[in-house]
Amino acid sequence: STFDKALVDRKEQYTSDDLNLTGLKRIIMRRASLELKENMFVNLGYGMSDGVPIVAQEEGIADKLIFMIEQGSTGGIPTTGLNFGAMYNPTAILDDGYQFDFFQGGGLDIAYLGFAQIDQFGNVNSSRFGNILTGCGGFIDISQNAKKVVFCGSFAVKSQQEITPEGLEISNSGKFT
């Protein structure tokens, strides 16, 4: 990642090139974004779900939503990828303990979360990716207290897909997670 002046200077505007989506992630984010309604408090988890604000901007509704991330930023547009955890033009930056007070109190209307694995019973693992133990972070508090949770992911690793005018074509389903 590189220095992004738009993160520290309100006069500096980020461009749509700073936040772009392609391929399968674009399709997943467009579907996930259909759950958004005006004036929602929206939490975004790390990974796949960080693209929801990009689609909200494209659809012209981002300014009618309150995005929140567990690191404490509220009211701006979260960064994506390895820069996730920062936010463009937040209206507030809270101590994460206070942010979680809001989450645990049921303040979130919707949470978009990624996952490592989901089994046939709907149990979700968010803490281990293959042999890498990342921990659950705020997943438990957020998923258990948000009014609605949308899990964002592909259910498969090493799959091969192609975006066509007709939709998504999966040529190799890969390994299911």
What is the role of each PLM region?
Residues S1-Q13, G81-T177:
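Conserved phosphate- and dinucleotide-binding cores of soluble alpha/beta proteins
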Residues R10-D96:
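N-terminal active-site beta-alpha-beta segment that forms phosphate/nucleotide-binding
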